[in-house]
Amino acid sequence: MKTRITELFNIEHPIIQGGMHFVGFSELVAAVSNAGGLGIITALTQPTPKDLANEIAKCHDMTDKPFGVNLTFIPSFKDPPYDEYIDAIIQGGIKIVETAGRNPEKYMPQLKEAGIKVIHKCTSVRHSLKAEAIGCDAVSVDGFECGGHPGEDDVPNGILLPRAAEELKIPFVASGGMANARSLVSALAFGAEGMNMGTRFIATKEAPVHNNVKQRLVEASELETRLVMRPLRNTERVLVNNAVDQIMEIEASHKEGSDPNALLEDCLLYTSDAADEYSG
């Protein structure tokens, strides 16, 4: 199948394995690329830029097909050394970068001068248009269905993708709830030129995830996700479990308009205690 996405990234199938923290390692990435899709290493999973350079080199040994690197620009009190991570990407011969999080405009000249094609993750049409304006080559349009961070607009792919098709000139892929051939057909029908899958790839044998987690994902129904961190406007879709239930109880205990720092502190305190209990 040929689309503008397969032509842009020189891949056989318009399927991208999106960057996922602690999942996007070379074993999974190479498997996806060798199968004709586009595998993506997650840069910030690697503790240092040197570790990223080593992971890129390892992946080159496992595939001669195109693969990319995800670089997420996260809001934090102290930014990771993004320039050094980008240097590792460039020196590693990477020609495709998936950006996410904050606006990547600051880093676009450095990436483009190295001949790198950039696909940016967006959860709205307005963000997609901004990505197009700053020179991104493509965008991944993430509907409200997506795992991880779906944004704050709550627009599902059935509405978001056709709107993106109406507005964008650059190619885009659909993301959010994508899992099989039906997903790809629907994405193409809505105007996308491929799809980005994340959670589905966690359930593969190459993903470095415990089999119990993989089985839980496979057995989960469409009713078993929850939205957490909404009061902080950092909404995250997660698979329901006891810890998620506790987080939601903590959120409910804080009245609307109350100090978000207090909510964050309570959530962090709970997760820290839960981690200590789990580790014994």
Please tell me what each predicted stretch does.
Residues 128-131, 192, 274-275:
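Small-residue (primarily alanine) positions within well-ordered alpha-helices
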Residues 57, 222-224, 276:
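Solvent-exposed alpha-helix faces
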Residues 151-173, 179-272:
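Conserved active-site-proximal phosphate/metal-binding subdomains
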